[in-house]
Amino acid sequence: MPPRLVADKHEIKRIRTYINGLDENVQGVIPEGHITLISGAAGTMKSSITFNVLYHEAVNGSNGLYISLEQSAESLLNHMTNMDYDFSKINLVVVKDLAELSAKMQVINRSKGSIFIVDVGCVRKEIRDIQTDNNKSWLNVIKNVIKKVSVESNTRVFVLDSLSALYVLSRFENPRIELFMIFEFLRDMNITSFLISEMPLDGSKFSEYEIEDFLADAIIVLKLTPFRRQVVREISVVKMRTTACNNDIFSLEFKNGQFYALYGGQNPLL
């Protein structure tokens, strides 16, 4: 479904990142239905900030989908538990067998928001009838999961962890065409999407093929920056369509269960 034409900018609905200090600097943040690249090297908290969006949306009554292609659901959730997320406030549905997806969606408490975590790594171990040399099979599996969960549970937000793993799994023969079709599929689903992208340490590019940079509606970059013999996590919004945004670099901190973007455009106070 293509985005409708709005008569006034206040008609544009937005999804927060729930990062204090960042949302206020990007016009309330991401327009609904947009696709955002979350780019960063290892250890920059890409998975954490995307899960943070899903969690707070679920606390507010919305549903979200997290598809992990490599990291196990247990590893992800143990990490989030250590960050003090309270899962009693939401429905947390872990799917390791796609045959159980419909049944698990039917028994959730409708008075709460939900996070559906599909552990594709586990599914890959169990499924034997998908040809691993067919670059379309796993991509179609992932699309079908997104479509099913989105339609049947009215999912508002989707996270793919990660694009890099998808490229290994699906081996794109013509990245420009195939990536265009993936991005258009997500837009047709009218779901706000966060696509995690592995970035080299030198920050020389935001994505594997660099085509993603142009197809995405927004790019949020996370970095680890040495500063006075300490390492500072940093966050910046490189681009965001339909949004007046501050492109300054902020320090990214997590404390007392909340993310904070601090010292935008300034040296961090260390």
Residue positions per predicted region:
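C-terminal regions of RecA-like/P-loop NTPase motor modules
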Residues: 2-9, 240-270
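Conserved inter-motif catalytic segment of the P-loop NTP-binding fold
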Residues: 67-156
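Short, ordered loop/turn segments at secondary-structure junctions
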Residues: 41-43, 69-72, 92-97, 122, ...
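Hydrophobic/aromatic beta-strand patches that form the interior of the parallel beta-sheet core
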Residues: 36, 65-67, 116-118, 194, ...
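P-loop NTPase motor core
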Residues: 130-214
